[in-house]
Curated annotation (Swiss-Prot):
Tissue expression pattern: Testis-specific. Exclusively present in cytoplasm of steps 14-16 elongated spermatids (at protein level).
Keyword tags: Coiled coil, Cytoplasm, Developmental protein, Differentiation, Membrane, Spermatogenesis, Transmembrane, Transmembrane helix
GO terms for biological process, alphabetical: flagellated sperm motility; sperm individualization; spermatogenesis
Domain of life: Eukaryota
Organism listed in the record: Mus musculus (Mouse)
Chief location bin: membrane
Chain's gene name: Spem1
GO cellular component, one term: cytoplasm
Annotated spans, Disordered: 215-238
Knockout-associated phenotype: Mice are completely infertile because of deformed sperm characterized by a bent head wrapped around by the neck and the middle piece of the tail. Lack of Spem1 causes failure of the cytoplasm to become loose and detach from the head and the neck region of the developing spermatozoa.
The protein's name in its UniProt record: Spermatid maturation protein 1
Length: 310
């Protein structure tokens, strides 16, 4: 019985390692559960305190960035102080003259042009031409811009016969600052004036030079032999003294003033009216002789023909 009660040493050695393994497995499981609990608690704390943690992190990064920028600027200022260059200020300006002022041809393109009949009646503002070195052939006798219509020229031809004796002997220019050009092909004596602004005008002489006897004899010979009887009647009349009066200057219509007028238009119109009144007052001094009577050669230096009947 004593032998049966003794434990066997093999069984004891066999049971001891199993108990130790079980204890180790339980301890490891407890450790894992503890770690899981700790992680869960940490996550809960972070979620609860995230707003405050975010503010703290923002302040920390802001302070760190300011320190870095201050140190970088301090390093850049030192080499700039060693090499100092003068400051350059660039100022862009625009020339107002080039923006506003345009040449006269460009203005004429956008301006409403009147019909040729109206443009022929209106006078053009002009300035005296002081450039005497230019040859006279550069300026045409008739302005194509103002005499486009045939009707205007027909109305203007009424003055031709009055100026015919003077156009043939009009080579001598009167002592004036304005350059005059003689007529071509029995056209009225006139001159074309061009100002600096591109304006054009025609000026007629009031007292042109008297015609030479040769010009009158040439005209009398060309008149023909159709008016011999009238020439004899004209010879019986007393010969008036060779007095050269002012020419009949046509009335210039009123024109709207513009910024380009260089002279006083009212003064010019007033002088022209005085000249016309003087011509009417002295009209009785001029004998009314027809064109056929001049063919006989009465010895007169001039022939006056009124324009009222034309």
């Amino acid at each position: 019985m004593a032998m049966a009660e003794r434990p066997r040493p093999g069984w004891a050695s066999y049971q001891n390692p199993n108990i130790n393994n079980c204890q180790d497995m339980g301890n490891s499981i407890l450790l894992l559960l503890g770690l899981i609990v700790c992680i869960n608690i940490g996550i809960n704390l972070v979620t609860l305190l995230w707003s405050r943690i975010r503010i703290l992190l923002h302040r920390m990064f802001h302070i760190i960035c300011e320190k870095e920028t201050s140190t970088s600027l301090g390093k850049l200022v030192q080499p700039l102080r060693k090499q100092t260059y003068p400051k350059v200020h660039l100022r862009c300006t625009m020339d107002p003259v080039k923006m506003t002022v345009t040449p006269p041809p460009t203005r004429r393109r956008y301006r409403h042009r009147a019909p040729p009949s109206r443009r022929a009646r209106c006078p053009i503002a002009w300035a005296p031409d002081t450039d005497d070195e230019k040859p006279p052939h550069q300026h045409p006798a008739i302005c194509s811009r103002h005499w486009n219509d045939s009707k205007d020229w027909e109305g203007f031809q009424s003055m031709q016969e009055v100026w015919e004796p003077w156009t043939q002997d009009g080579l001598e220019q009167p002592p004036q600052t304005i350059r005059f050009q003689p007529a071509v092909e029995a056209r009225p004596l006139k001159s074309e004036i061009r100002s600096d602004q591109g304006l054009e005008a025609y000026v007629y002489t009031v007292n042109p030079p008297p015609p030479s006897p040769e010009a009158l004899s040439h005209k009398n010979n060309a008149a023909g032999s159709g008016g011999c009887v009238e020439g004899e009647q004209a010879q019986g009349q007393p010969v008036s003294p060779s007095f050269l009066g002012p020419a009949n200057v046509p009335e210039i219509p009123r024109r709207h003033s513009s910024g380009r007028i260089v002279y006083d238009a009212r003064d010019v119109r007033r002088r022209l009216r005085e000249l016309t009144q003087e011509v009417e007052a002295l009209s009785h001094c001029y004998p009314l002789v027809s064109g056929s009577s001049a063919a006989e050669g009465t010895g007169k230096d001039w022939v006056y023909r009124p324009l009222k009947g034309r």
